Amino acid sequence: MKTQLYKGSSKILYSAEEDFLLIMAFSDNVTLESGEIIEISGKGVLNNNISSFLMDKLEMNGIENHFIEKINMREQLIQYVEVFPVQVIISSVACGRFVKEFGMDEGYVFDKPIIDFKVRSREFKYPIVNEYQILNFGWLTRDEIKAVKEQALRIYDFLSGLFIGVGIRLVECKLEFGRVFNGEESIIMLTDEISPDNCRLWHINSNEKLGFELLENEPNKAFESYQLIADRLKEK
């Protein structure tokens, strides 16, 4: 019998039969900015399908990640990764905090994607943290920061092209990385998920928002947009 190891707002981690493997289950829950938890029936199934598909595509293109295989509609088998305490946010278009904090016009296209680091802490509301702080806190080494940034940009470039091919624009995404040890050596590996829960996705022609951006104000339309994204990716 599998043992629950962790329960977040949208995913649950369970033990697996083999060492260094875990089962990740996608729930229908989502936590709004207000802290309210709502349920979007069927969202977990779609996110499992979307993330499995994208992680598999990344692996085929030389990006190592924790995904091993999809087990069923809601669960996937993953490799254990010692996750870094920071998230990597890559933005190619002014959105979210760039509009709220800097007064930029939403939709302004940056010359190059911008990389931000945020602390992985809901308690402290995911504050921005810079590279000097990350180094001084001992969270990552200088070489690890460099490698994470290079991988993040490579992933973003690949995903952007893939989404453009199905008429969707990847505006911003949140990635998580960690270490996998092989004896005394370690490699950096992509972990968590890639889905409409952690990617800002807009319709390429109309800039209509898709995915999690609808959850706050138009939750009744959210599932339809998740389904649209999943259906578009099936074409690839």
From Swiss-Prot:
Keyword terms:
ATP-binding, Ligase, Nucleotide-binding, Purine biosynthesis
As recorded in UniProt, its EC number(s) are: 6.3.2.6
Q: Its GO biological process terms?
A: 'de novo' IMP biosynthetic process; cobalamin biosynthetic process
Q: Answer yes or no on keyword Calcium.
A: no
Tell me the superkingdom of the source. Answer: Bacteria
Which GO terms of the cellular component aspect does the record hold? Answer: cytosol
Q: State if Nucleotide-binding is listed as a keyword.
A: yes
Q: Which reaction does it catalyse?
A: 5-amino-1-(5-phospho-D-ribosyl)imidazole-4-carboxylate + L-aspartate + ATP = (2S)-2-[5-amino-1-(5-phospho-beta-D-ribosyl)imidazole-4-carboxamido]succinate + ADP + phosphate + 2 H(+)
Write out the pathway annotation from the protein's UniProt entry.
Purine metabolism; IMP biosynthesis via de novo pathway; 5-amino-1-(5-phospho-D-ribosyl)imidazole-4-carboxamide from 5-amino-1-(5-phospho-D-ribosyl)imidazole-4-carboxylate: step 1/2
The entry lists its GO molecular-function terms as: ATP binding; phosphoribosylaminoimidazolesuccinocarboxamide synthase activity
What InterPro entries does this protein map onto?
SAICAR_synt/ADE2_N, SAICAR_synt_PurC, SAICAR_synthetase
Q: Name one Pfam family in it.
A: SAICAR_synt
State the family it belongs to. Belongs to the SAICAR synthetase family.
Q: Mind telling me which PANTHER family this protein's record contains?
A: MULTIFUNCTIONAL PROTEIN ADE2, SI:DKEY-6E2.2
What is this protein identified as? Phosphoribosylaminoimidazole-succinocarboxamide synthase
Native source organism of the sequence = Rickettsia felis (strain ATCC VR-1525 / URRWXCal2)
> What lineage does UniProt assign to this protein's organism?
Bacteria, Pseudomonadati, Pseudomonadota, Alphaproteobacteria, Rickettsiales
